A protein has these predicted regions:
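FIC/Doc superfamily catalytic core
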Residues: 1-41, 47-309
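Single conserved hydrophobic/aromatic residue that forms the stacking wall/gate
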Residues: 308-317
Length: 317
């Protein structure tokens, strides 16, 4: 039984990764060239809900046309892999309706609040955007008056949230590999291997704490140990979040990855989601430094705001 469970988990993780790659493709469809007068233009053709659609991409260039061809080829390969995984899941006895109604409702609740969650996390990272600006970036991928770095961070947060709210991902375990994938997404465009465990020393601004180099086996074991403790779901999520922050497992993006990883665990148990609201960020950062420098975890755990699925107002843990 354990072997089959592990097989299903690995297949679900692979399927979620493939779906994420498919969703992040800038163009999905078969490229076509249309001529108007002496000019040529590129479109992508795709069947949606039984109807053939044609979406304008841009003026024809050899480079853009080759990009569209590569995208189309990669999309076909991904869909072929997805069909193979679906067959393997069916043979392993996996059913799509294995998620409980609480978890399904929790996914919908988190999706409805995703823009605010991304905004709150951006504030925690020092991204200087207003909520309307953040919303514009999430919806359209760009905005004037905001640095390219901040836009990339916000888009990465959006993609990381979309990743964990995928049903296959929610059905997967909250383990080191899940955390590593989340870190890779939040570091996209900044580091080639953003989900790789840190191998160089780092310091933390405003703190005397110097995190030791993390050991992958130790990190895996500690995450497993926290999850297997007999504690309330929300307390486990907070412990996961703070442990990953303090350990500084990755070269960058640790707070972003830690919060989203904790939310993966929480949402997968139908427990709502964790937020650190904008107004609480200064106090949270102050207490986080205390926690880094040796204070008990309770000094900061009580400051983490928690939104429960059945109570849309924010409660203090």
């Amino acid at each position: 039984m354990a072997a089959k469970y592990n097989e299903i988990q690995e297949l679900l993780r692979s399927r979620a990764d493939l779906n994420a790659r498919l969703n992040l493709m800038p163009y999905d469809g078969t490229p076509e060239i249309k001529e108007r007068g002496n000019e040529k233009y590129l479109y992508v053709r795709k069947r949606v809900a039984g109807k053939q659609t044609s979406t304008y991409v841009g003026a024809y260039t050899e480079e853009l046309y080759n990009l569209l061809l590569r995208n189309a080829r990669e999309a076909r390969e991904i869909r072929k892999e997805l069909r193979s995984i679906d067959k393997q899941l069916a043979n392993a006895g996996y059913s799509e309706d294995e998620l409980s109604s609480d978890v399904i409702n929790n996914i919908a609740f988190a999706r409805a609040n995703m823009k605010m969650n991304v905004y709150d996390q951006a504030v925690l990272e020092g991204v200087a955007t207003s909520f309307p600006q953040t919303e514009e970036i999430i919806d359209n991928g760009k905005i004037s008056g905001v640095t390219a770095t901040d836009v990339q961070k916000i888009l990465n947060l959006k993609h990381a949230w979309e990743f964990i709210l995928d049903r296959d991902v929610i059905a997967s375990r909250s383990d080191y590999y899940m955390l590593s994938h989340i870190a890779r997404v939040v570091n996209e465009g900044f580091f080639a291997e953003g989900g790789r465990i840190r191998g160089v020393p780092v310091t933390i601004g405003g703190s005397s704490y110097v995190p030791p180099l993390p050991n992958e086996l130790d990190v895996k074991e500690k995450i497993r140990e926290i999850i297997e403790e007999s504690d309330e779901v929300i307390n486990t999520a907070i412990k996961l979040c703070l442990y990953c922050m303090k350990t500084q497992i990755f070269l960058d993006g640790n707070k972003r990855a830690s919060v989203i990883f904790a939310n993966h665990y929480l949402i997968s148990h139908g427990g709502g989601f964790l937020v650190i609201p904008e107004k609480e960020v200064p106090e949270f950062k102050r207490l986080l430094v205390k926690y880094y420098e040796g204070e008990d975890i309770t000094v900061i755990a009580d400051s983490v705001s928690y939104t429960h699925l059945t109570l849309p107002t924010k409660l203090e843990v």
